[in-house]
């Protein structure tokens, strides 16, 4: 087994390209007639020849089952305060840091470093991958996109990117927004007749950004409906109405507030409103400065449009059972609180419909605890403090090593295109097996072009085989198997 040491502080990472987005999904090969699931052998879980549902009946989805609130360790931190503060400092650097080594989109040093080539390269890659005349992608009507459609998208995206930093490019997100690979709401699916393609795997869907996220605008689309932006995690296109400009006075105030008191949401779909006025929907992964904490309440800063496209700060009151000061102590009972809100929600490739995929799930889950993870699985495993590569070991050794050395809630498990959080080990089907929390699309049989769909955030064991269908390839039995330790 190969051990790779990485710096104590979360490593810098490259802004992802859409083609590198790893989100619990593997590319298929073209099926033949012998590979398809026959309706005659289908159970009630049958969907169509390339899809069925995986039965979760044997795997409890109760958070209290896997994280008992009455256990002796429920209130014991799983990492020490100094380590947590180190990660929290890295998080604030990514969001608000303005020094030469910081990577905030409001940081002129950082933006200047990527303007020369990276921003243009990302766009060019998307042009070549999705709009080339020989490239075929499908729309929501199961028909291939036309040459005319491709040219319209290319023309709308083909505006100039200034290679010089301008302070006027700084913006902030005022409501959660989807990030697209190109400026269109139209999907671009690979062949929907193949397993693991079509819905929900829209190649243009990259990620989402939460309200309060600092961004830098690189360019407008030709129709002005979209902005091409740099965020702390991705480069892509967002709707123009979801962001507003920030001036130096706003940046100074917002950064000062965030450095003093930064908080995070710990529940899904919190409607942020005041005096009958709705502002945005928040969920885990949304972080905002706050001014003070009153009994049962926080007074929280939210960015709003002042009416002329510029940001101003509005103060709203939030309950302390939905918003907490960061970094929240990383204890089993606290992480269980967040999981109770997040678990059981549908899978969303690239945050489609603001649901999570595998990497978005962990990014959002760990944010309240001051731990900033990148936005794709391959970068997330490299962002941990220490990586153990078990790719050359067999399934038995992989399971035994994780049972013996895994640290609950601070060990990430990576396989190609997918990532999970180890939460401890338990006896499952008479075997001592690692348990995970993950957001997963599904499992696949070896050599069979079909998917057994789970389709959401679940507690799931890393069994060598699954009795529900022994032909399914285990998540432990993949070409790569790496453990990343947050420590």
Question: In which residue ranges do the predicted regions lie?
Answer:
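C-terminal motif of bacterial Sec signal peptides marking the signal peptidase cleavage site
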Residues: 21-23
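Bacterial signal peptide processing site
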Residues: 25-27
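Boundary regions of SH3-family modules and the immediately adjacent low-complexity/disordered segments
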Residues: 31-180, 184-191, 196-200, 216, ...
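Low-complexity, Gly/Ser/Thr/Pro-rich intrinsically disordered linker/tail segments
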Residues: 50, 55-71, 75, 433-435, ...
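SH3/SH3-like (including bacterial SH3b) beta-barrel domains
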Residues: 190, 196-210, 274-283
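Second-shell loop/turn segments in exported
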Residues: 202, 275, 321-326, 344-353, ...
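...with weaker cross-activation on analogous glycine-rich loops/strands in unrelated enzymes
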Residues: 208, 374-446
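Active-site nucleophilic cysteine motif
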Residues: 339, 349-380
């Amino acid at each position: 087994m190969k051990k790779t040491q990485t710096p104590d502080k979360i490593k810098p990472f490259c802004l992802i390209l859409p083609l590198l987005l790893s989100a619990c999904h593997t590319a298929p090969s073209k099926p033949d007639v012998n590979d398809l699931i026959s309706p005659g052998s289908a159970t009630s879980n049958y969907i169509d020849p390339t899809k069925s549902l995986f039965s979760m009946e044997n795997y409890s989805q109760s958070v209290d089952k896997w994280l008992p609130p009455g256990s002796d360790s429920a209130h014991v931190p799983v990492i020490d305060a100094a380590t947590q503060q180190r990660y929290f400092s890295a998080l604030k650097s990514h969001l608000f840091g303005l020094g030469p080594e910081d990577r905030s989109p409001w940081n002129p040093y950082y933006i200047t470093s990527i303007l020369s080539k990276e921003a243009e390269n990302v766009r060019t890659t998307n042009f070549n991958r999705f709009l080339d005349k020989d490239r075929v992608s499908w729309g929501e009507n199961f028909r291939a996109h036309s040459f005319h459609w491709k040219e319209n998208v290319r023309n709308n995206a083909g505006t100039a990117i200034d290679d010089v930093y301008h302070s006027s490019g700084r913006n902030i997100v005022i409501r959660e927004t989807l990030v697209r690979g190109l400026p269109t709401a139209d999907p671009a699916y690979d062949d929907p007749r193949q397993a693991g393609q079509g819905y929900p795997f829209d190649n243009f869907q990259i990620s989402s950004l939460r309200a309060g996220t600092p961004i830098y605008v690189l360019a407008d689309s030709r129709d002005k409906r979209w902005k091409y932006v740099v965020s702390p995690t991705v480069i892509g296109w967002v709707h123009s109405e979801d962001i507003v400009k920030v001036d130096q006075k706003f940046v100074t105030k917002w950064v000062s507030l965030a450095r003093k008191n930064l908080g995070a949401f710990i529940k899904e779909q919190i409607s942020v409103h005041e005096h009958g006025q709705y502002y945005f929907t928040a969920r885990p992964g949304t972080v905002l400065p706050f001014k003070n904490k009153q009994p049962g309440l926080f007074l929280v800063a939210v960015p709003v449009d002042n009416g002329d496209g510029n940001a101003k700060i509005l103060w709203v009151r939030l309950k302390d059972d939905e918003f907490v000061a960061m970094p929240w102590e990383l204890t089993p009972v606290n992480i269980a609180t967040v999981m109770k809100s997040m678990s059981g929600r549908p899978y969303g490739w690239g945050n489609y419909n603001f649901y999570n995929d595998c990497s978005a799930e962990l990014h959002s889950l760990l944010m309240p605890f001051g731990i900033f993870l990148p936005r794709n699985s391959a970068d997330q495993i490299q962002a941990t403090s220490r990586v153990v590569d078990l790719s050359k070991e067999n399934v038995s050794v992989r399971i035994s090593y994780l049972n013996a050395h895994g640290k609950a809630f601070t060990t990430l498990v990576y396989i190609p295109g997918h990532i999970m959080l180890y939460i401890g080990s338990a006896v499952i089907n008479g075997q001592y097996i690692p348990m995970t929390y993950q957001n997963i699309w599904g499992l696949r049989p070896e050599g069979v072009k079909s998917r057994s769909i789970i389709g959401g955030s679940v507690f799931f064991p890393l069994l060598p085989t699954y009795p529900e269908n022994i032909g399914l390839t285990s998540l432990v039995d993949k070409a790569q198997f790496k453990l990343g330790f947050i420590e």
